[in-house]
């Protein structure tokens, strides 16, 4: 069976910067990838678009959707937007159930989202807690008779913009050397946040240095960092 990876971000561009390489790598290896945006980031993540004095919320959403859809396609993934609003992102019972339904529907082997702390972004921790809780609901052992459940997906956190301030501890490096050009092409679609392209290209090189030292593999030129949340179950060390 093809390995299934689902990346759920607070805003429509979050996946590109932080997990674009891992998504493309999974697809390159025969996997199936889905990107889910809880919101478009139309209020707090679209500064370039709001320089137009005639700009509107609906037009920003339209542009952000097109950008994210094109970026996901570059990586070989599908894109889905929940359009729940941002700044602030607010998750009630209905929104939580929607996210749980999205997880059940896709049934990922690997689920990726934000860290639980981010002092510079009010929406990222909200998204983390929502996805973490929705995962538990979607994979809730012992309640199969009440609603459909899925096999518990592995949960990873992608690297935040300021990792030292977000309690991020990398436990896994993904070698994205072979797909880095795809990540660059995907990032190029995000014109509403174009200033981040250089930052995350450089970050991939920094993490590749760490990956080389950790693995001894001198061929790693670009990498992405992730933090594993759920213990890995193996038959031997």
Name what the model sees in each region:
Residues 1-106, 236:
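Active-site rim/loop-helix segments in enzyme catalytic domains that contact anionic ligands
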Residues 1-6, 29, 88-237:
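Metal-dependent de-N-acetylase/amidase catalytic core
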